[in-house]
């Protein structure tokens, strides 16, 4: 497993940033390897499930993903349930004046590639 963290400040209010991050249909807009998203449930709630198709060095893969934490304007966490590259991405949001600081705490493994 590889653990990592990154922080960025976005020039948008926290409610706007959270709405964008928590909507899995936006993943292809900001995660380069994600080609598409298909929903099993209505997204943007704790427990929602969806599938992502990703282009990886070994070819295209599908991960079933669950939204395991959903705290509006504070935190959203995605965790893979299937696929060759298990991952957990937790996005923590903090209001900084009129901006939003996002801290990503991630864990990913390439064990299935």
Protein language model annotation of sequence segments:
Residues 1-46:
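Hydrophobic ligand-binding cavity/cleft-lining segments
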Residues 3-5, 60-64, 86-90:
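Short, surface-exposed coil-to-beta transition loops
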Residues 14-15, 42-45, 68-73, 92-101:
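A short, structured loop/turn motif at beta-sheet edges
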Residues 38, 65-69, 79:
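A short, surface-exposed loop/turn module that caps and links secondary-structure elements
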Residues 45, 51, 64, 90, ...:
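C-terminal and inter-domain tail/linker signature
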Residues 55-61, 110-113:
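Short, cysteine-centered beta-strand-loop-beta hairpins and adjacent loop/turn segments enriched
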Residues 81-113:
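Beta-strand/loop substructures that line and gate deep hydrophobic ligand-binding cavities in soluble
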